[in-house]
Amino acid sequence: MKILITGCCGFIGFNFANFLAKSNKKIRIIGIDNLNDYYSINLKRKRLKELNKNKNFIFYKIDINQYEKLKKLYKKYLFNYVFHFAAQAGVRYSLINPKAYIEN
């Protein structure tokens, strides 16, 4: 079984991906994240380092708005399930840059 998790370095995506990876080693988990700097890049890197300890986890640095890259990923893995946790964080930022939220 192949599962795509978007936003895998965010709080919810990380915890979900880590739980799945540890609970069933037969599942192949593909995680994507754009690793934007809205909040701590170091925190995201720590989470990614933790996820990479799981042999059934693979990471791609992809923004969900990069349609062609996503299309290639879908063709490569033919996912059974997609869990979409990618989102632009921060309510206040939405007042300054609403386009970032619309595109996401």
Where are these predicted regions, by residue range?
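N-terminal Rossmann-like NAD(P)+-binding domain of SDR-like oxidoreductases, especially those catalyzing
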Residues: 1-104
